[in-house]
UniProtKB/Swiss-Prot annotation:
Involved in the transport of maltose and maltodextrins. Does not act as a receptor for phages. The gene is lamB. It is found in: Cell outer membrane. HAMAP family: LamB (MF_01301). Pfam families: LamB (PF02264). Its main location: membrane. The record marks Y31, Y66, W99, F252, W372, W428 as: Greasy slide, important in sugar transport. It comes from Klebsiella pneumoniae. This is Maltoporin.
Length: 429
């Protein structure tokens, strides 16, 4: 009995140690940015984006506090088989006060099971809400291939010459479908589901240091029983993507070609809006972007893109953008960055153009000497000059020429310029 009692504290200590180790196994990842800024003409920091463009050059041009907080843990592992639970809660506020309340967005909650299928080694079976294999241009915060949402799939199936991924995800539109009530009046659904089915083949070796990824997405509206879509709704659509990635100069270059039709043209990224009656048409995008660390002194990010959205409603546009962000590294933790970006958006309906130049100079302290090193604290000054001749009508939402020159009746910003300055932190981990 004495021996047993003496062993008891040791057993308790071992058990506590095991429990502590399990608790420490929780993975904490995320992203956040926040800061303070001012506008030269007075007031808080303004941010600048060309009307009709889908993104903006972000250095010294972000006016919100935004964060994504991810918690995950491997819940079970036996040999090479495992289950991993992943979550993500995101929020955004306007950087106006100490206390700013907001409703957080539950962006991810999924289980990923690796090597569960013996005859498909290396594959991952997953289900739940997820950021699914997103492709983006960091310097303009632009996601050009993104079907994220609730879904399920099987990814990274090794075919020998490449890896195959299959997925189905969903996003919903407000209203969009209707039925008839007892008095023959239309009763609209609160939401109408849109389903996207995604097939990708990645890791196709094309040349030394170069790989190709090919994908096709089909999206369609899926109204509930006894509900129908409005006349003229696009109902469904396709998007095809080809992306070549080249390892070069301590970084990468990505060349992308995409083509989308009808319901897949609304977001131009892989989300479907099949209940819409104004998105029949097509989209073509040609994109080249990259990021490189040439040596201990210089780094670079860049983007060039052409996108043409041709809609039957004549509410499409032609958008092209080009920008560079060179980085000079004074020390391993201090650098200077200069971002120069230009956007031009031509209205399909009015044939008028909106354009904007934006230049930012930033002094930065970061955890390392790479263009990707974070955390970072930067002080910045931004100059933006724009000349806009069309906007979206405040009443109809259609593109219209801005005759007021001040955007009084449209979203046009007229012809003007502005200077902002401030400080910002950015971190991912």
């Amino acid at each position: 009995m004495m021996i047993t009692l003496r062993k008891l504290p040791l057993a308790v200590a071992v058990a506590a140690g095991v429990m502590s180790a399990q608790a420490l196994a929780v993975d904490f990842h995320g992203y956040a940015r926040s800061g303070i800024g001012w506008t030269g003409s007075g007031g808080e920091q303004q941010c600048f984006k060309a009307t009709g463009a889908q993104s903006k050059y972000r250095l010294g041009n972000e006016c919100e506090t935004y964060a994504e907080l991810k918690l995950g843990q491997e819940l079970w592992k036996e040999g090479d088989k495992s289950f991993y639970f992943d979550t993500n809660v995101a929020y955004s506020v306007n950087q106006e006060d100490d206390w700013e309340s907001t409703s957080p967005a539950f962006r991810e909650a999924n289980i990923q099971g690796k090597n569960l299928i013996d005859w498909l080694p290396g594959s991952t079976l997953w289900a739940g809400k997820r950021f699914y294999q997103r492709h983006d241009v960091h310097m303009i915060d632009f996601y050009y291939w993104d079907i994220s949402g609730p879904g399920a799939g099987l990814e990274n199936v090794d075919l020998g010459f490449g890896k195959l991924s299959l997925a189905a995800t969903r996003n919903s539109e407000s209203g969009g479908s209707y039925t008839f009530s007892s008095d023959d009046t239309k009763k609209y659904a609160a939401k109408t589901a849109n389903d996207v089915f995604d097939i990708r083949l990645a890791g196709l070796e094309t040349n030394p240091g170069g790989v190709l990824e090919l994908g096709v997405d089909y999206g369609r509206a899926n109204p509930q029983d006894d509900y129908r879509l409005e006349d003229g709704a696009s109902k469904d659509g396709w998007m095809w993507t080809g992306e070549h990635t080249q390892s070069i100069w301590g970084g990468f270059n990505k060349f992308v070609v995409q083509y989308a039709t009808d319901a897949m043209t609304s977001w131009n990224s892989g989300h479907s809006q099949g209940t819409s009656i104004d998105n029949n048409g097509s989209m073509i995008r040609v994109l080249d972007h990259g990021a490189m660390d040439f040596n201990d002194d210089w780094g670079l990010m860049y983007v060039a893109m052409y996108q043409e959205l041709d809609l039957d409603s004549k509410n499409g546009s032609t958008w092209y953008t080009v920008g560079v962000r060179p980085m000079y590294k004074w020390t391993p933790i201090m650098s200077t960055q200069l971002e120069i970006g230009y956007d031009n958006v031509k209205s399909q309906r009015t044939s008028e153009n909106n354009n904007q130049y934006k230049i930012t100079l930033a002094q930065q302290w970061q955890a390392g000497n790479s263009v990707w090193s974070r955390p970072a604290i930067r002080i910045f000054a931004t100059y933006a000059k724009w000349d806009e001749n069309w906007g979206y009508s405040n009443t109809s939402g259609l593109q219209t020429k801005d005759s007021s020159g001040s955007g009084a009746f449209t979203s046009s910003r007229g012809d003007d310029s502005e200077v902002t300055f401030g400080a910002q932190m950015e971190v991912w981990w």
